[in-house]
């Protein structure tokens, strides 16, 4: 990279003489700084001890090439440290090569010695690691010469040999005992015993029968086993074991019919018992126990392939019981809600589970009449519940028109949402159904019929009407709100019996308080027919032609005619609302200020009249100029001051 000229920029533009001088001065400064930096680096390198650097590198090598202990630092960290130390050592070598060659030669010797030590460490480490990986079995052994014949095998103690007895001494000169020799059966490499020596005896204890049989077949003579041994040996014979197993299988397959018949008899007995004892709850529990046992037996008979099924076995009772078992309390409750007839078995299941759930229910269920009457009651009750559910949906009837039946005890899930007051008039056409807040399948505990198990529901919220207890205030039909001033409103006349009462959203109370800000002390005598319009018609502005035209257009365009002028009942309060707070002055002389206040009130009502067309229909209003507004303001000030 060549040097750039100081008279031009990087792109070749001619530079200002001032910039040229600044650039040259900066170049000189950088050159001087570079010399200083080189001197600082040389001084730092001279301060470092090269022998210490070599020792640090040796420590790193010992840590890395240690076959016993894993290195504490990571392999990458060790490489980085050695690289930095080596670079520093080479810089010191270059420095001393220029300045002091004698020190340079000494440092070279140190480096060569370090490299030799490092190579030795690495070689030892590799040898140990390779020895750890090599398997011992793969190492070839040298060929061993044959054992000399003068070595006696008897002198070598065998692990299973019995030591010679101390008590009984056998004479070498006595008659030799005959022994069955089994030496030819052994390997050929074993040297023979010298004459006159006995081979070591067998291990203590009788030999196992398998060994005796094997050697009896090989040598050629039969061995007579004791009867106990022969019986034990039969256990090891595969043919006999197979034959015995077949006999056992045939006997078990013949005997399998007996438990099956017993189970069938027990199954039929349980069927008859359950048919006769249906009205008793305890017999229900026993019946379920029998049924579970019979179901378990049936599944075991299906699984085992050894059972024999005959053609004359009755199979319908099992199917019937299975169908009876499958009717759960939930299905029975849904059948009852739909108004259908519940099978006897399912209903008793439901009653049994419910008797366990309801601890504080009445004892009327214990004294049950005959089965037929109970069935008719439950059927009629289910149909009445379904009809009341169809006739009285909770949303279609306001709570003020429907009265819940009187509750003799605490209801299942909370207080009954029944307003205490009933509006006067003829009774409505709807029968009193369940309360609007409760789900349709919940009945008060006083009503007859089968109670289903209580579902896990959230407790209902507050009742739709007023809280119980008639506080002084509006009757239950009105929505809660600020108490209306004036005469108390009358209830709407109740609907004739044939027509359902209107929804709560459609009923409007006859007298609603006005929405606008009322004067502090009084109530306006007539309510506004359109509370959305907040001002009077623009006929307040004293311009006769424009006022007549605008009033005519109002009557043509708007559906509701605005005919009331602002009735100022408290002029002082109304005027001071439009005045800045700093100018609110109260005078004792009311007679002198009454007329200007009335006039200023009429002027101050103009901004409200201008704001009116935004909320209501579009009304053409004559625009006031700044002079008119200023003149009205000055008149207002004159009236106040």
UniProtKB/Swiss-Prot annotation:
Domain of life of the organism encoding this protein: Eukaryota
Biased composition (Low complexity): 381-404
Positions of post-translational Phosphotyrosine modification: 236
UniProt feature coiled coil, ranges: 75-133
Molecular-function GO terms, alphabetical: protein phosphatase regulator activity; WW domain binding
Signal peptide: none
Segments for region (Required for nuclear import): 1-45
InterPro entries the UniProt entry points to: WW_dom-bd_prot_11
GO biological process, alphabetically ordered: mRNA processing; RNA splicing; rRNA processing
N6-acetyllysine, modified sites: 13, 565
Crosslinked positions (Glycyl lysine isopeptide (Lys-Gly) (interchain with G-Cter in SUMO2)): 557, 572
Modified residues (Omega-N-methylarginine): 192
Oligomer status and interactors: Interacts with PPP1CA, PPP1CB and PPP1CC. Interacts via the PGR motif with PQBP1 in the nucleus. Interacts with the WW domains of WBP4.
Protein name stated in the entry: WW domain-binding protein 11
Organism: Rattus norvegicus
């Amino acid at each position: 990279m060549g040097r750039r000229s100081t008279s031009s920029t990087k792109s070749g533009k001619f530079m200002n003489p001032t910039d040229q001088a600044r650039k040259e001065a900066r170049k000189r400064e950088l050159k001087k700084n570079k010399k200083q930096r080189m001197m600082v680096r040389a001084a730092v390198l001279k301060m470092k001890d090269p022998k210490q650097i070599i020792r640090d590198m040796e420590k790193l090598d010992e840590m890395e090439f240690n076959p016993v202990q894993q290195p504490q630092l990571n392999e990458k960290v060790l490489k980085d440290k050695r690289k930095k130390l080596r670079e520093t050592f080479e810089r010191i070598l270059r420095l001393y090569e220029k300045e002091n060659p004698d020190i340079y030669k000494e440092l070279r010797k140190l480096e060569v010695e370090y490299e030799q030590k490092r190579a030795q460490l690495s070689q030892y480490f590799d040898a140990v690691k390779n020895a750890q990986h090599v398997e011992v079995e793969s190492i070839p052994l040298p060929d061993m010469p044959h054992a000399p014949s003068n070595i006696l095998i008897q002198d070598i103690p065998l692990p299973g040999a019995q030591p010679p007895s101390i008590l009984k001494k056998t004479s070498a000169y006595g008659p030799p005992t005959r022994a069955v020799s089994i030496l030819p059966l052994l390997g050929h490499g074993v040297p023979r015993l010298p004459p006159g020596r006995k081979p070591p005896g067998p291990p203590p204890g009788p030999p196992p029968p398998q060994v005796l049989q094997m050697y009896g077949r090989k040598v050629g003579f039969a061995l007579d086993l004791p009867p106990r041994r022969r019986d034990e040996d039969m256990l090891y014979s595969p043919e006999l074991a197979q034959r015995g197993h077949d006999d056992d299988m045939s006997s078990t397959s013949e005997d399998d019919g007996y438990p099956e018949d017993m189970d069938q008899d027990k199954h039929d007995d349980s069927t008859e018992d359950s048919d006769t004892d249906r009205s008793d709850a305890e017999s229900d529990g026993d019946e379920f126990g029998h049924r579970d046992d019979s179901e378990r037996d049936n599944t075991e008979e299906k699984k085992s392939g050894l059972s024999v099924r005959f053609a004359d076995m009755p199979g319908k009772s099992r199917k019937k019981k299975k169908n009876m078992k499958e009717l759960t309390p939930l299905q029975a409750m849904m059948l009852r809600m739909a108004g259908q007839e519940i099978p006897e078995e399912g209903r008793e299941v439901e009653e049994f589970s419910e008797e366990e759930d309801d601890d504080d229910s009445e004892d009327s269920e214990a004294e049950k009449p005959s089965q037929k009457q109970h069935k008719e009651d439950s059927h009629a009750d289910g149909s009445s519940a379904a009809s009341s559910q169809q006739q009285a949906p909770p949303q279609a009837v306001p709570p003020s028109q429907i009265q819940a039946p009187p509750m003799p005890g605490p209801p299942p899930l909370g207080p009954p949402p029944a307003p205490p007051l009933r509006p006067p008039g003829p009774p409505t056409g709807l029968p009193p159904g369940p309360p609007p807040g409760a789900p349709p399948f919940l009945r008060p505990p006083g009503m007859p019929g089968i109670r289903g198990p209580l579902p896990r529901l959230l407790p209902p919220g507050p009742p739709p009407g007023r809280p119980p207890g008639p506080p002084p205030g509006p009757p239950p039909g009105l929505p809660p709100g600020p108490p209306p001033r004036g005469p108390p409103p009358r209830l709407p006349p109740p609907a004739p019996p044939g027509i359902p009462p209107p929804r709560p959203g459609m009923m409007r109370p006859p007298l609603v308080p006005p929405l606008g800000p009322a004067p502090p002390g009084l109530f306006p005598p007539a309510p506004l027919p359109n509370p959305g319009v907040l001002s009077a018609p623009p006929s307040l502005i004293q311009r006769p032609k424009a006022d007549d035209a605008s009033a005519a257009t109002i009557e043509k365009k708007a559906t509701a005619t605005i005919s009331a002028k602002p009735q100022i009942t408290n002029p002082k309060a109304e005027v001071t609302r439009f005045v800045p707070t700093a100018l609110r002055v109260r005078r004792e002389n009311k007679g002198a200020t009454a007329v200007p206040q009335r006039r200023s009130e009429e002027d101050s009502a103009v901004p409200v009249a201008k704001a009116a067309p935004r909320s209501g229909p579009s009304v053409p209003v004559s625009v006031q100029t700044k002079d008119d507004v200023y003149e009205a303001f000055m008149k207002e000030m004159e009236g106040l001051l």
